[in-house]
Amino acid sequence: MFRYLTSGESHGEGLYVILEGVPAGLKVDLDYINHELSRRQLGYGRGERMKIEKDEAQILTGVRGGFATGAPITIKVKNRDYENWEKFMRTTGEIEPGREVTVPRPGHADLAGGLKYGHKDLRNVLERASARETAVRVAAGAVAKLFLAEFGVRIYSHVLRIGSVEVEYPGGLPEEELKKADEHPLRCLDAQVEGRMLKWVDRARENGDTLGGIFEVVVFGLPPGLGSYVHWDRKLDGRLAGALMAIPSAKGVEIGDGIALANIPGRMAVDEIYYENGHFYRKTNKAGGLEGGVTNGMPLIAKVSLKPIPTQVKPLKSVDIVTKETKPAQVERSDITAVPAAGVVGEAVTALVLMESFLEKFGGDRIEETKRNYQNYLQSIANY
């Protein structure tokens, strides 16, 4: 069974992830993991934290000589800002006063988390709830991408919307175009539309505001048959949507044409099936590569809508949990928009879900065993 668990706080010593079930023999490329971490820090409109942190991974366990041993893999991403926070975040001894939070920020987990766990200092909530945690999800996702690459699977993301400025690509984008997303400051592939997006970000910065948007994840090279239609909790679209919704600020997930399919007649909402040269195919991909919770061999496409980051430079009204007086909400460092970076996180969590699905389908304690099972499956469907 493949699974992962993260730990750590935003201003603690570091962030950690443990991955269990990675097949022995998989090549684990530290440079590639660090490359993926650097991609998460890309994007116009990022906050001051990105000037402090240059995320780099340390592989602590489960890898020897660059290859997975089959034991749990532990990865650490150090928080460089910890040296400024050690006296406020140390795990033993007394915590020095000065960084307490008693005024919750609307739109964050602060108040709900304080009520749930009984914290009187809401820093205990916001430190763990912070989007900083996604750094180790990206590190874990990099390992999953390395695994999927062994089977020819490629994952990309790009930005479709910032604020009210949106670009549409009827029929989707070719893989060669998607490879270029990181060359653009907002990871939007339409330069003209991106120019308008950049102006929106600048305007939001001037106004002390934040912006949400939409990113899209596209996966090529998946075989048909991942996931299941047999039980609700094994449907791949449900599991994928859950992982994408767990990205901070995510408020909606669409698979394929998603919500737009609700507005058209049924005959226009499905992808007709054709057969030629020994294989089944479709001329359209409105389903986004998933039918009945199972991959159908077409590219997997998912869109994620993000709300604006709720932390505001001009704080909103809140209530002090100690005095119960109305006060301005706590102000923390924040991005103007995190949509470009969230796309990279989206790639990572998609890769993790797909790796889990691959190992459920093909098994294998060793990567050679998984590959052999995969090739046998491809042969069986070729003869269908």
UniProtKB/Swiss-Prot annotation:
Reduced FMN (FMNH(2)). GO terms for molecular function: chorismate synthase activity; FMN binding. Coiled coil: none annotated. NADP(+) binds at residues 40, 46. It is an enzyme of class 4 (lyase). GO terms for cellular component: cytosol. One of its GO terms (biological process) is aromatic amino acid family biosynthetic process. Its EC number is 4.2.3.5. Keywords: Amino-acid biosynthesis, Aromatic amino acid biosynthesis, FAD, Flavoprotein, FMN, Lyase, NADP. InterPro entries: Chorismate_synth, Chorismate_synth_AroC_sf, Chorismate_synthase_CS. Pathway: Metabolic intermediate biosynthesis; chorismate biosynthesis; chorismate from D-erythrose 4-phosphate and phosphoenolpyruvate: step 7/7. Its cofactor is FMNH2. Signal peptide: none annotated. The keyword Translocase does not apply. It catalyses: 5-O-(1-carboxyvinyl)-3-phosphoshikimate = chorismate + phosphate. Pfam families: Chorismate_synt (PF01264). FMN binds at residues 128-130, 292, 307-311, 333. This reaction introduces a second double bond into the aromatic ring system. Homotetramer. Belongs to the chorismate synthase family. This is Chorismate synthase. It comes from Carboxydothermus hydrogenoformans (strain ATCC BAA-161 / DSM 6008 / Z-2901). The gene is aroC.
